[in-house]
Structures are given as structure tokens and as C-alpha cells.
Amino acid sequence: MAIVEARDRIGGRTFVAEQDGQKYEIGGTWIHWGQPYVWNEIHRYGLTITESLSGAADTMSILSADGLVTDTAEAIGTDLEQILTAYCDIDGAQGRVAFANPHAASPELLASTDALSLADRFAMIPAAGRQRDLLLSFLTMNAATDPAKGGFHDQLRWWALGEYSADSLLKRLGRYKIAEGTSALALALLKDANADLALGHPVSQISVVDGAVRVRTKAMEIRCKAVVVAAPLNVLGDIDFTSGVSHERLAAQRERHVCAGTKFIARVDRSVGAWVGFAPFPNPLTMVVADREVGGKSVLVGFGPDDSIDLGDIRLIESELRKFLPGVVVEEVFAHDWTNDPYAKGGWTWFSPGQTSRVLNELQTPAPPLFFANTDWASGWRGFIDGAIEEGIRSARDLLSYLRASR
């Protein structure tokens, strides 16, 4: 078995930067026992868990047109719980009936919700004051784009995966981390694979000729019985599938998801405690969380919905953080531009209105001898590490069945 990887490392949209003995998760970070596939692997490899301070915050702030408001996490958390419940309550039962199984939406649910954007649904509910700002911030953070571009159906799926509770969902999204770093999990999986690894070889073309697969890069050509294509959705369209893939699948592969936000990690000159900040769209920052403290100084993680923050401009980042934390000084920033990364072209997965109905089934359907596995079309925690493992298991099962049948 051979792994042909475009990057100079494995791990996709997750990797760890290390400095002065500290690990900084530049991409995917948080995990939870409510994400069963990744939790199983964490225990398989004996990895340990640590927590972000923001996962048990005691204070929260909301930046709105009326200025900055800081309150207890309990008070603001109650507001978020109330307004997000109203937003996701499409059946009078908090979504529990309509989306009883978050891994498998019914055709009826898709028909009634998939065409809506986050903004469409936002306009349907009475939201005012800080509840309005909280909800708009949270929705923008989740989709990492303008709420008019993000699909409402994906928010419903997250809500169901979070057990129909804002508090429960937040714990799954941003409380627990792998102490050794996500790269440690990726390396453990690679070691178990016992595969030949070719780094720095972007695949340019895949074709099927007489039942065999030909994979081409700039430097080499590989012929094999079958291939698992693990490129993310926003990159699939860059690979030339000359044969073996239907027109319908090619169309699905060319339709990108909409997550195009920014993430950075900033070490600042003071402790801000266990704190979370929210700001509604179109603020350049929609959410900032205190991850941990190093030497009495906070390490913050900030998220924005677009490219309005230059990730290489430490003073601009400082200026935006001062809107939440007056006078704060940024000492160092760690970041990666995932949207302009040629092997990612975006962050975690968020579908546009109608996209689930258009592409999900096609993306999940194998085209032997070609198989496709990426978190971007997982049924459950799509866009998360958990979804990547889910898709890997599914495609491995399909591949083994194909190889056994073709002997």
C-alpha cells in the first residue's frame, strides 16, 4: 500500500506548531466523547486529554453596535441556550423529532430545510438585543462565512449532534483537546498503516484503464488495482479524473463548500482568565476564546468569517482583539491561511443552501475501483477529525469488499 500526499506532512487540515515546549494547534483542535470514531482512536493509542479554559468559562463578552458587554458565563450562556433553541426548534420539540438521527436526515427534513440559508432562518425568529448578537455571532462562527452563504441544514445537524442543547454543543466544539496534539494521532494512525509514504507529490490526474487505476503526479506515475482519494472537497475539482467517474459525480466534486474563515492563535501580555468573546457578523472577529495560560499570559484563539484580517499583521490582530480586551498587547501570533492553501482551499466543512441535497449522496457513493474518503462528506461530524475517521472506515470497508469480489 502506498500513500501519495501533496503536502510535506500528513494530517490534512490539522497540524501542531511547537515553540518553547508549547504546542499550538494550527488547524483542527477539539474532540469529545460524543464524537465516537475519534474517541475510540484516542483510547486505542493511549493519548491523553486536556481542556481549554474557555470550555468552562466564567466570563463572556459580547461586542455589538452598543459597545462591549461583559457578564457571567452563566447569564450569557442562558441567553444563547434560549435563542439557539428557538432557532433550531423546527418541530415544536427542539428538533428532536424532525432530526432524531443526526447521521441520517430524512427526505422530508431535507425538503423543508436544505434550501434555507442561516440568514433565511434568522429572519424567521424574533431575536433582539444581546440574544440577537449572540445568535448571529454563533452562526457565523460555525459556518465561518457570511450567514447568507451558509446552509441552515448544517446548523440543524450540529444541533442534533450536540444533543439539542447549546451548552452540550459548545462542549463538543471547543472544550477537550489531545494533550499530545492532533499530529500525534495522525502519526499513530500512519504507523499502524505500515504504508509506503510519498510526501510532496500533488496528484494531477487519475484515470481508470481496463479496470486498473493510473495515478499521475508531476514526478511519477503509479498503477494499481484501486485508489482511495482523500483530497478535501474544495480540492477535488483540481484533480483531472479522465475516466472512471460519472458526470454527476464530477459535478458534485466541483461544488465547493463555503467555509472560508480565518483562525489564529495569539499569546497576549496578560491573563484574561476563563473567557469567551462574541461579535456578530460582519465583525472581522466573530469569536475569541481563552485556550490556556503560559507563564501567567493567556493564549487566545480567534476566528473570523472572511479574509478581512491579515494573519501576518500582528498589529491588526491586536487592534481587533482590543475591541474585546482594551489595552491588550499581542506578543506572538501563530496562524495558517487555510482558505488560500492550495491543498485545503477552506476550513472545516459547511455546505451552502441546497448543497446537501445536491452532492452528499453522490460524494458518499463509491465508483470502483475509485473510492473517496474525506471528512467533508461524512454523515455525522462532517469537517471534524471524527468525520475523517468515519469516512476512512466506510471507504476501507467498501474497498475490501471490492478487492475480495475481484479476486
Short names for language-model regions:
Residues 212, 277-407:
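Conserved flavin/dinucleotide-binding core of flavoenzymes
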Residues 201-202, 207-208, 216-276, 323:
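Central helical "cap/lid" subdomain
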Residues 22-95:
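Dinucleotide-binding Rossmann-like beta1-alpha1 core, especially the glycine-rich loop
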Residues 99-201, 230, 240:
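Active-site/ligand-binding neighborhood in enzyme catalytic cores
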Residues 69, 271-276, 309-310:
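Short helix-loop capping/hinge motifs at secondary-structure junctions, enriched
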Residues 1-19:
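Glycine-rich FAD pyrophosphate-binding loop
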Residues 24-31, 103-111, 171-179, 250-255, ...:
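Active-site rim elements
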